[in-house]
Amino acid sequence: MSDETGLLIPLELYEESGVNIGTKQKSADMGRFIDSVNSDGLYLLNLNQTDNRIRIIASFLNQFEPSQIMVVSARQYGQRPARMFAEAIGANSAVGRFIPGSLTNPALRSYKEPDILFVTDPASDQQSLREAVNTGLPIVGLVDANNKLRNVDVALPANNKSRHSLALIYWLLSREVLKLRDATTDEALAEANDLEEWKSTF
């Protein structure tokens, strides 16, 4: 499922899932990823940049051993797709409340030593982000119009609050990561994974 414009999926699918719908506030950091403001006063993210970043991040993640990637989501609507993404690519996940010390305190049962952290929202996932910074881990993050990019090494501009957007982004990322490993094709993944199953049911 790709698009004649060169996008990974048709533009309409991004728009129907609200991937480009930002917030009414924007951070100075996110200005370069914003296209315009809609009639409701919401900043709209540039979908060409989102699409391009998905390609870049899929390639970047494949530089790491899958088991050394940790995907986190404290945000409710991100928990199911984040977990499914981690399972699909062979990574670890920590969804729901992130236990303080999980990246810094070896005495904890939840302690992990990943090589890279992937956050669903730098604001909601602040605890894990802080610990990753303290341990020198590279950080990839889904970033909305209001997010700050401080401590996020590779940003993926997208609506990180909607269950539809989060499901699509994580589904698409898993597809691209696996395609680069020659582990799937567009058609095979579409047949094996119903996008609806990736959506949070909260």
Where are these regions (language model features)?
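Ribosome large-subunit tunnel/peptidyl-transferase-proximal elements
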Residues: 2-192, 196-199
